[in-house]
């Protein structure tokens, strides 16, 4: 019984050895059979017949065993490009171009892959490596003075007056109270981009904001209403460096000038004393001195961002220092943009920022998702969570400098891409805001004059904006 068992084991072991030898020999034979010549012949056949998936399987297998050539990279890149997998096409086109044998067609496909993948800065580098004739076909109006131009215009409205315009501001003591009603705003933005050097882009933008505000002052149940405008002029400047492929370093600055003339009140102790002795009328104007005050502010933001493309991932880090509404702020954030389908038709962007003001830090988180609806129409949704006040995003381009705190910002954008280098967009954004109101309560008397204790209360309202925008790439 033991002899039979031993023979069976020997035969089993011998069979395994023979099978392993056959596998090794077949693999060696296959490697000998797969040469540059037959890979070139096979991929050329697939290339000419538009059999892109078969070409990818054969080409990637050839790369795995160490076969490398310009034609293989060019054909693989083209196969991924035709299947709209632009992120997979990019490294093959880059490798083909790096050999020095690439023609204009390969560079054009690399340029278009960068554009479709959202890598504008890398695309600009490739654009200026092409011949002037091919460059003019892609960008007919390309020039050294202006690379792109944009214009946005919009209007905002709120329910602040509806919700809070009739509040009893002076409290139970009818002492004193005030608030500012934000009724909306009108704004427009003009931007241009220059490309003096293919790896160095400069962006400029001017933004005008006209806010419709109302100051309410209340004393002894009498309310004074003062309608006024706050006008802001904003200048933004950004530099984008591409020191090496896929890496972008971008410092920026944003200057904000605001002007307004608003009524202010100061307690008039003489008038109040006369009132106590029977002089004067029971009016706010006899207890407080009202005066129009011109207010001018100069604010700024200095920002820096660094990002790096790694396949379908674009991680980044950003930081800023700012002076807004009389206080200093600092921010540091981490972000990542992902194309989960390896094509540009779905992207997800996440950004987490630590914002510090007056030694108080809070976390602000932004989530964005964009997808293609039809061939040229795109839809983006976005939301920002946190205590948003004196805050900036997009490397200082977008500023939240309203004195009222935004608790939630959300919205959507429709973007249409025309075939002649123009993009149009329609944007809706909404904000849930919280503002502060002042109420003075009498806590006692000194020398026949009241002693006030100032109290701060809060009120909420919604703020909505609609904007239209156009951008043209020359």
Question: At which residue positions do the language-model features occur?
Answer:
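N-terminal secretory signal peptides that target proteins for export/translocation
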Residues: 1-11
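Cleavable N-terminal signal peptides
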Residues: 18, 28-29
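Alpha-helical protein-protein interaction scaffolds
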Residues: 31-142
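Outer-membrane beta-barrel strand-turn architecture
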Residues: 83, 117, 192-200, 231, ...
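Outer-membrane pore/translocation modules
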Residues: 124-129, 133, 143-149, 158-170, ...
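Residues that define the transmembrane beta-barrel architecture of outer-membrane proteins
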Residues: 143-147, 182-188, 229-235, 296-302, ...
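Outer-membrane beta-barrel translocator/channel fold
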Residues: 179, 209-218, 226, 253-270, ...
